[in-house]
From Swiss-Prot:
It comes from the Eukaryota. Keywords: Sporulation. The keyword Ion transport does not apply. The gene is IRC19. GO terms for biological process: ascospore formation; double-strand break repair; mitotic recombination. It comes from Saccharomyces cerevisiae (strain ATCC 204508 / S288c) (Baker's yeast). Involved in sporulation and maintenance of the mitochondrial DNA. Is probably involved in a pathway contributing to genomic integrity. This is Increased recombination centers protein 19. Induction: During sporulation. Belongs to the IRC19 family.
Amino acid sequence: MRKPSITITTAKAIITPDYTLIKSHSKYQLPSRFQKLDADSPERSTVVKLFYRRFMRLKPFISNVKMVKDTYRDYVRYKFMKENYELKRYLVFNPDGLRSKINLELLSNTKCCERILPVTEMQRTLEFVLKSCSYLPETKVQKWDIARDNTYCRQILKNLLTMQYEKYRSILHRGIGHDELDVKFSHLKTTSSPLTKLNKTEKKKIPLFKVFSDFDTTLIYLNETLGTRL
């Protein structure tokens, strides 16, 4: 049975049984381009809050499923408040033999507020998420390339959130600590270590760590290609 054709118009949106058209986009988009800021810039806090609010405002458009929206919310919080992306990137691009103990210690001990603010990458990431929330029908007649690009963004974000949810499940139910996966990135270290150097507990984690390691490695390379910070 077809849904009744009802259209609701408000000051902010036009709503049909299938789609919602947002009239004003200003609170989801950046007001202007920002230059890369250093850790001592007095504007740093303002810019971080500006990006954070816009990512969070997109939460209702991520999915109709509460679990997915909650995972998105938790992931955004983690990215802004806890993730040491420079350490994660270093572990991906530097195999065991090329890793410097000094560099690892410096990156591991760098506080979030002391890191360079990657404004350009954050802006491109916001554009990526905006595309994943936007819908255009894929037809050859009208904007097929734009519609397909939005679909790719939506599928990538869906896979990312699915994997992040699996990490949360592993932390809750599989005896893997939060620090191992999201702070120390042990899964990017253990899988490349010789088995003789691992204890029994670490060996049990290898299959799951391999899955997370492959995904995060691919994600880092994707970010390098797109100039994003997914």
